């Protein structure tokens, strides 16, 4: 069986175009996680709060970030996909974030195969209100679990690409 974290390349042209393996579809309150060792998706928990995921959420294959997990990615989609869907995505920004004091940044991206997003290249091309909604959700969604998160702000496409290169290098150091 193919392991979506270990066997799939980070993308066709990283860091400019990457693969996003979706774990959680937009609109879901269920937090699914990919079990990297066993190669399947499992329900980690249902969010304790009334929040739902505002975008499709997943990870970039063959990456490892500072929190010890694959690098997270959020993909702006018109319609939600499903756990296990692989999207070819163009990074446009980076949400800097702490989760229980661990660096847990998230790449923001758009699908390369949707003509609605062909001109979206950086954060300036995204409505500020959408960025505020995303940051608000990730600032508050764990509060009722007694956990703390802090969104430190947004950085542009160049920062996202730097994070991707860093995460690919960390993966290679750890897993060869």
Curated annotation (Swiss-Prot):
What are the GO cellular component annotations? cytoplasm
Q: Which GO terms of the molecular function aspect are on file?
A: inorganic diphosphate phosphatase activity; magnesium ion binding
Q: Per the UniProt record, which EC number(s) apply here? A: 3.6.1.1
Transmembrane regions listed in the UniProt entry: none
Catalytic reactions on record: diphosphate + H2O = 2 phosphate + H(+)
Its required cofactor(s), as named, are: Mg(2+)
Record CDD domains: pyrophosphatase
**Record keywords:** Cytoplasm, Hydrolase, Magnesium, Metal-binding
Give me the residues that bind Mg(2+) 2, please.
Answer: 72
Q: Report the record's Gene Ontology biological process terms.
A: phosphate-containing compound metabolic process
Pfam families in UniProt? Pyrophosphatase
- Function comment: Catalyzes the hydrolysis of inorganic pyrophosphate (PPi) forming two phosphate ions.
Q: What assembly does the database describe for this protein?
A: Homohexamer.
The Swiss-Prot or TrEMBL record describes its family as follows: Belongs to the PPase family.
Protein name per its UniProtKB record: Inorganic pyrophosphatase
